[in-house]
């Protein structure tokens, strides 16, 4: 494939945008390449400015569960835009979307909308601190919860790609209140509690980690985490910005028996529009302004266009829950095919699937935490990514990112993807 126009566009962007992109992972630094500049999407496909077509397994990093330009979502957005882009005032569509979310998540009585997943998590952390009167929070190495200061400590996602344990500009006085546990290791959590006599406001976790690759939390680990939080009066937050409505209709909470105290959401609930949300029981949410003393606000929170897109998306999912069986079967078919391709050239690979989310590592052992994920062959992944891209397969440009299946992806497209994997790995191994 030719990428001449994208290369030129990247050079132009670099002159006026830091790194040429508005989110670091998009720069393709993790795979030592140049990002295709996308012109449009249609169904399962992306089209770049050079005229190349790709089967898209990134799905705008998760939101597009129905693929690009879904007719129903597109119609709801157009209808909403005709009424106005933003009002900075309450609308009934906010309430309707909130009602759908509350119905689907037992742990949520009330929900508030914001404009991004980062905002959702930042606000949830503030609410947890306000509700408990404690400063310390606990997160897990490799879990990414957006780029708010308190949580840029040994995060995954782009920070893993760039090998940065935290970010300059984040005060040490702030991060001293962020404690670190090891994912799927309850002893590390017990030690954090033992070392914090002043208490911990909240424990935040991706119940299905998606930013150190796809790494689900063990059920026993989540149960032990729930028990520890209960024993210490600590709020348990599930960050389901990625897994919400992706792992199942009820997110990770449709798979695990463990129920959190608070939940953060994003991605699918906006169907590709900028949105985030956080919710909890009525008593906790009553601490939030204007009812309570914990302040949170946003000019574009509950934007009517985003709400309309999200409402249509969730109602489509709710009307046909069998979609998740279909998506899960396709995800399994894909990773099984990738594994066969790797086996054919004696390349070790481990895979996992949770609903419409999938992941793979070039590794010879199961991945249970960030340290395991870091042992995957990143150089091989970079070569594999380039070969797949050249064959029209658009995968996440980091071995630490999760892939996604949309309803627009067909069995024939998966067969084409697996064929490309065979060709790419055979080419790499010579």
From Swiss-Prot:
The modification N6-(pyridoxal phosphate)lysine is found at residue 267. The keyword Isomerase applies. Pathway: Porphyrin-containing compound metabolism; protoporphyrin-IX biosynthesis; 5-aminolevulinate from L-glutamyl-tRNA(Glu): step 2/2. InterPro entries: 4pyrrol_synth_GluAld_NH2Trfase, Aminotrans_3, Aminotrans_3_PPA_site, PyrdxlP-dep_Trfase, PyrdxlP-dep_Trfase_major, PyrdxlP-dep_Trfase_small. One of its GO terms (cellular component) is cytoplasm. Its EC number is 5.4.3.8. One of its GO terms (biological process) is protoporphyrinogen IX biosynthetic process. One of its GO terms (molecular function) is transaminase activity. Its cofactor is pyridoxal 5'-phosphate. The keyword Cytoplasm applies. It is found in: Cytoplasm. It is an enzyme of class 5 (isomerase). It holds the Pfam family Aminotran_3. Keywords: Cytoplasm, Isomerase, Porphyrin biosynthesis, Pyridoxal phosphate. Its main location: cytoplasm. It catalyses: (S)-4-amino-5-oxopentanoate = 5-aminolevulinate. NCBIfam families: hemL, PRK00062.1. Belongs to the class-III pyridoxal-phosphate-dependent aminotransferase family. HemL subfamily. Homodimer. This is Glutamate-1-semialdehyde 2,1-aminomutase. It comes from Sulfurovum sp. (strain NBC37-1). The lineage of its organism: Bacteria, Pseudomonadati, Campylobacterota, Epsilonproteobacteria, Campylobacterales.
């Amino acid at each position: 494939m030719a990428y001449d126009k994208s290369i030129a566009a990247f050079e132009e962007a670099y002159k006026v945008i830091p790194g040429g992109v508005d989110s670091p992972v998009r720069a393709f630094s993790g795979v030592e390449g140049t990002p295709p500049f996308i012109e449009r999407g249609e169904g399962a496909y992306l089209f770049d400015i050079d005229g190349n077509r790709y089967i898209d397994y990134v799905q705008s990093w998760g939101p597009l569960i129905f693929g690009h330009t879904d007719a129903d979502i597109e119609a709801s957005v157009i209808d909403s835009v005709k009424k106005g882009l933003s009002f900075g005032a309450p609308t009934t569509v906010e309430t309707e979307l909130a009602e759908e979310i509350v119905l689907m998540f037992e742990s949520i009585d009330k929900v508030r909308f914001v404009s991004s997943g980062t905002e959702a998590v930042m606000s949830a952390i503030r609410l947890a601190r306000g509700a408990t009167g404690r400063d310390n929070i606990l997160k897990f190495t490799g879990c990414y919860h957006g780029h708010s200061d308190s949580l840029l400590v040994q995060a995954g996602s782009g920070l893993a790609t760039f090998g940065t344990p935290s970010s300059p500009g984040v005060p040490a006085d702030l991060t001293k209140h962020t404690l670190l546990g090891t994912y799927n290791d309850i002893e590390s959590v017990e030690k954090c509690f033992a070392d914090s006599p002043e208490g911990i406001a909240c424990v935040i976790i991706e119940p299905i980690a998606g930013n150190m690759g796809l790494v689900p939390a063990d059920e026993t680990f989540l149960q032990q985490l729930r028990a520890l939080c209960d024993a210490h009066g600590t709020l348990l937050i599930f960050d389901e910005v990625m897994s919400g409505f992706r792992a199942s209709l009820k997110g990770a909470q449709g798979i695990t028996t463990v129920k959190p105290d608070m939940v953060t959401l994003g991605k699918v609930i906006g169907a590709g529009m900028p949105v985030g949300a956080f919710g909890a029981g009525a008593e906790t949410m009553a601490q939030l302004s204007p009812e309570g003393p914990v302040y949170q606000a946003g000019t574009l929170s509950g934007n009517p266009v985003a709400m309309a897109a999200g409402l249509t998306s969730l109602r489509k999912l709710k009307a046909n829950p069998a979609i998740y069986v279909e998506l899960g079967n396709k995800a399994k078919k894909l990773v099984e095919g990738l594994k066969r391709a790797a086996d054919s050239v004696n390349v070790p690979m481990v895979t996992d699937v949770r609903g419409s989310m999938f992941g793979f590592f070039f590794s010879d052992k199961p991945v249970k935490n960030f340290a395991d994920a870091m042992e995957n062959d990143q150089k091989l992944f970079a070569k594999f990514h380039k070969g797949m891209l050249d064959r029209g397969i658009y995968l996440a440009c980091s071995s630490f990112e999760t892939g996604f299946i949309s309803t627009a992806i067909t069995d024939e497209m998966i067969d084409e993807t697996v064929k490309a994997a065979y060709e790419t790995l055979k080419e790499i191994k010579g």
